[in-house]
UniProtKB/Swiss-Prot annotation:
Catalytic activity: oxaloacetate + phosphate = phosphoenolpyruvate + hydrogencarbonate
E.C. number: 4.1.1.31
Class in the EC hierarchy, top level: lyase
Name of the protein: Phosphoenolpyruvate carboxylase
Similarity comment: Belongs to the PEPCase type 1 family.
Tagged with keyword GTP-binding: no
PROSITE patterns recorded: PEPCASE_1 (PS00781), PEPCASE_2 (PS00393)
GO biological process terms held by the UniProt record: carbon fixation; oxaloacetate metabolic process; tricarboxylic acid cycle
Region (Disordered): 1-20
NCBIfam families hit by this protein: PRK00009.1
Alphabetic keyword roster: Carbon dioxide fixation, Lyase, Magnesium
Length: 936
């Protein structure tokens, strides 16, 4: 065998004979996988020997037989092979299959980029999900360029990066993989000579060998500031350049559209795409996010953006070599030039360069004031900028001077992008949300109230009494805290964080921390408690002015059902309504997909979220307040994941209304934004979907009443089935902890936050992320489908006159139901009941194992059967051939990792603790996560 069959891949996917583009894309993808697989195979043979190479191939072939045919002989052979391996060989096997998953992902991403480029060539029809297509749709609907500009003037599209621990890759690994991606891209884009082709492959070999010799796992646990630093790397990769470019491209498209309409494009497009972050501000369940960490986070963010501005100013100064006698200047630019510290006689007659050097000096002084260290070049004394707006005003003056003096083309280059970047990123880079659990706010307020008003006993007050007390405190001008009272460590820590937030507003501007989120919001008092705490540090004024948004997060099924009533009562309180009005009469509400799914299952969670939005829309319209929804979606379908475009346009009419915030979590950040072209595409998808859902979706017919009624019935039936298994079946907790890697996940150094809220085994206390992540690892993906089959079966039995035909029509005509089922199709395609059966064998109590797994297996088959019947498909992913091909390419190399993981789990749990065995389990978790791509 000359090369590892990692390069062979599955059998070619059959395409229609006339689908030449698809066939070519498939061929090129297979070629890339073959190339990387061959290089990896050579590396394994050279570094580990022929015997390890042969062992990898033997396991791969046996695993394919087991997966394809549920071959019992293959199952026994696989067990024998794995039993006979040393721990050293096991680690090598795991690393080989893990790295193949990583390399296959790179090849797949490159193929997606290739297809994006093919669809963006001159003369090609715009693709769905991109702005060109949405703008064309708007024109067809008679929406003018001026109306679109007006829409974007008040629009907000905000991806919010979070540090949820589902990204298991180290940055060292990601950097090397980006190098490999760049080399593949070079083979696509550049006409290489024979020598260059050879050099390219040699560099690929070096990169793969370096990967092979790099630790896949972190040796130490991440700190919060480590997570912040990791998150900031995506600004270098994508956001700092692509956010301004997206605005410029859209601005140009609208200008062209206005010209075609015979109108003038007035002014610049408003900045609507703004980055957000939870990393360093999310305290819910994370005791390591303190006032000091908040300060450090903001400093790191500011350092990153100021260094970028300084680098761009340096380049801009090099570019603007315009001589004064060849290019005119305004008096403002002349004044800027006169303040420049640059005294070189060579630049005496280059006013634009002098102006930029003066701006550079002021920005460098600003950076020093904001504690930025290791500046690129020392400068003379200069006055720091008071704000990012003042900095931009100087660049605006240069822009005006250039355009006034016939140099508009020059103004549209680096200067245009830098001005837009300042508008989007300010001196703070990303808007940092603060988040804390309502129970913590309640304890803090209770302690403060009881000290300030002896005899209050806040903890035992009912909701009405709490509301009355909190309203009176909001009106009060006296402080609630006292320097003469010794408070608990928790209260001292909470107040310190709020005071640090107030300092951040003074230092970086209000955009640095614009939101404060209350997780597990259950009543009006939860929001008023936070408002009182913010008033205590000056972020809210007793007169009714607020410098920050108070945002409820509704997470459980019960809370989603109550959220409209809660917000109705809240907005009816004059003291709170004044705060909302001071924020432009906009109230943000966050909806949690993760906990609602863990609480009620996939079907019920999706439906209750949809109904909650409808209820909120009606209440907010009644109060005359603009609703902005913040969607707390995870990477996996079980936590609200799935294609962003489909999810946004499937929202009920009026839910988006020009403004949306959406979390980007864990491994999804890497897959969406580590590559600049993929990142640009994903940012554009968010903008296009927001426009589509806001301006074009309301023209659609509302869902048929019969569909709403059927969905309510299906949800109730699915809820009963899901709760019946997860919360009401004796032994289920034992089954879950024994048949998944939930115990072992906590040993991974992939995040700063604990996996459970409390130190119990109860499902209620487990965080949604490890819950979903664990089911993904054992390939059941249970949170993404369980209960659907039972629900449809019961519904069809109860409604024989409607039957499956009614649900088929519902799927075809209702975007919400179609998106729900499409996401289920995706998650079921990644599941494997055969592999899951091997994890079930880890449950020592055979009665519990057989009873529970038989229920899961029956529901899995039932859910697939009914899903295919409703979607009118012969097999899973029939309507998504791109993902089907992806899975067919990658999963023959993913499945062996599951088999090895089961073997290692058994050994880890039945023998004395062995660091190598545990590390082997951790490596399999890494590899499986990479292969699944959206596992948490």
């Amino acid at each position: 065998m000359s090369s590892l069959n990692l390069s062979a891949g599955p059998e070619p996917v059959s395409e229609r004979p006339d689908d030449a583009a698809a066939i070519e894309a498939e061929t090129r993808l297979r070629n890339d996988i073959r190339l990387l697989g061959r290089i990896l195979g050579d590396t394994v043979r050279e570094q580990e020997g022929q015997s390890v190479f042969d062992l990898v191939e033997n396991i791969r072939q046996t695993s394919i037989r087991f997966h394809r045919d549920d071959d019992k002989t293959a199952r026994a052979e696989l067990a024998a092979i794995l039993d006979g391996m040393s721990i050293q060989d096991t680690m090598r096997i795991v690393r080989a299959f893990s790295y193949f998953s990583h390399l296959a992902n790179i090849a797949e991403d490159q193929n997606n980029i290739r297809q994006m480029r093919a669809g963006s060539t001159a003369g090609s029809a715009p693709r769905a999900g991109l702005l060109a297509k949405t703008l064309a749709h708007a024109r067809q609907e008679g929406i003018s360029a001026a109306e679109l500009r007006k829409f974007f003037a008040t629009a907000l599209v905000s991806p919010v990066l979070t540090a949820h621990p589902t990204e298991v890759r180290r940055k060292s690994t990601m950097d090397r993989e980006m190098q490999i991606a760049g080399l593949l891209d070079q083979r696509d884009r550049v006409q290489l000579t024979a020598d260059e082709w050879t050099d390219n492959e040699e560099r690929l070999r070096r990169a793969v060998e370096t990967l092979w010799k790099t630790n896949l796992l972190r040796r130490t646990k991440l700190t919060v500031l480590d997570e912040v630093t990791n998150g900031l790397s995506f600004y270098d990769y994508t956001f700092l350049r692509e956010v301004p470019r997206l605005h410029s491209a859209l601005e140009d498209r609208l200008a062209d559209a206005a010209k075609a309409e015979g109108a003038n494009a007035e002014g610049e497009l408003a900045s609507f795409l703004r980055m957000g972050s939870w990393i360093g501000g999310d305290r819910d369940g994370n005791p390591f996010v303190t006032a000091e960490v908040l300060h450090g986070t903001l400093k790191l963010q500011s350092t990153r953006v100021l260094r970028y501005y300084l680098e761009e100013l340096h380049e801009l100064g090099s570019e603007l070599s315009l001589a004064s006698h060849l290019a005119g200047t305004t008096d403002t630019v002349k004044a800027l030039a006169e303040t420049s510290p640059d005294t070189s006689p060579h630049r005496k007659y280059e006013p634009y360069r002098l102006a930029v050097s003066g701006i550079y000096a002021r920005l460098a002084a600003t950076a020093l004031k904001l504690e930025v260290e290791n500046l690129r070049a020392p400068v003379g004394e200069a006055e720091p900028y008071a704000s990012a707006q003042d900095f931009k005003a100087d660049l605006d003056a240069i822009h005006l001077s250039l355009t006034t003096h016939h140099s508009g083309v020059i103004a549209r280059g680096r200067l245009r992008q830098l001005r837009r970047a300042i508008d989007c990123f300010g001196f703070h880079l990303a808007s940092l949300d603060m988040r804390q659990n309502s129970a913590v706010h309640e304890r803090t307020i209770g302690e403060l109230m009881d000290a300030a008003r002896p005899g209050t006993s806040y903890a035992v007050l009912d909701e009405d009494a709490r509301i009355a007390l909190l309203i009176s405190e909001l009106r009060s001008t006296r402080p609630l805290t006292s320097m003469f009272v010794k408070y608990s460590d928790e209260t001292v820590g909470e107040l310190a964080v709020f005071r640090e937030a107030a300092k951040a507003h003074a230092t970086y501007g209000a955009a640095a921390i614009p939101q404060c989120i209350i997780s597990m919001t259950k009543g009006v008092s939860d929001l008023l408690e936070l408002a009182v705490l913010l008033k205590e540090v000056g972020l809210i004024d007793p007169s009714g002015r607020s410098a920050i948004n108070v945002v409820p997060l509704f997470e459980t099924i019960e809370d989603l059902q109550a959220c409209a009533k809660i917000m109705d009562r809240l907005l009816s309180i004059p003291e709170y309504r004044r705060l909302v009005d001071s924020r432009g009469s906009v109230q943000e509400v966050m909806l949690g997909y993760s906990d609602s799914n863990k609480d009620g299952g996939f079907v019920t969670s999706g439906w209750e979220l949809y109904k909650a939005e409808i209820g909120l829309i009606e209440i907010f319209e009644h109060h005359g307040v603009r609703l902005r929804l913040f969607h707390g979606r995870g990477g996996s379908v079980g936590r609200g994941g799935g294609p962003s475009y489909d999810a946004i346009v499937a929202q009920p009419g009026g839910a988006v209304n020009g403004q949306i915030r959406i979390t980007e979590q864990g491994e999804i950040i890497t897959s969406k934004y580590s590559n600049v072209e993929v990142g640009r595409n994903n940012l554009e998808i968010l903008a296009a979907a927001t426009l589509e859902a806001s301006l074009l979706q309301p023209k659609r017919v509302a869902p048929h009443r019969d569909y709403l009624e059927a969905m309510e019935q299906l949800s109730a039936l699915a809820f009963k089935a899901y709760r019946g298994l997860v919360y009401e079946t004796d032994g289920f907790v034992d089954y879950f902890w024994a048949s998944t890697v939930i115990n072992e996940i906590s040993t991974l150094n992939i995040g700063s936050r604990p996996a459970s809220r409390k130190k119990t085994r109860a499902i209620e206390d487990l965080r949604a992320i490890p819950w979903v992540f664990s089911w993904a690892q054992c390939r059941l993906m249970l949170p993404g489908w369980y209960g659907f089959g039972s629900a449809v079966s019961a519904w069809v039995t109860e409604h024989p006159e409607k039957g499956i035909a009614f649900l088929q029509a519902m799927y075809q005509e209702w975007p919400f139901f179609r998106t729900l089922l499409s996401n289920m199709d995706m998650v079921l395609s990644k599941s494997s009941i055969g592999i899951a059966s091997r994890y079930a064998e880890l449950v020592e109590d055979t009665a519990i194992r057989d009873r529970i797994f038989s229920r899961i297996r029956a529901e899995w088959h039932s859910s697939i059967d009914y899903l295919l019947a409703i979607m009118q498909q012969d097999h899973l992913l029939q309507s998504n051939p791109l993902l089907e091909r992806s899975i067919r390419h990658r999963f023959p190399y993913l499945d062996p990792l599951n088999h090895v993981q089961v073997q290692l789990l058994r050994e880890h749990r039945t023998h004395d603790p062995d660091e190598q065995v545990l590390r082997g389990v951790q490596l399999t978790i890494n590899g499986i996560s990479a292969g699944l791509r959206n596992s948490g």
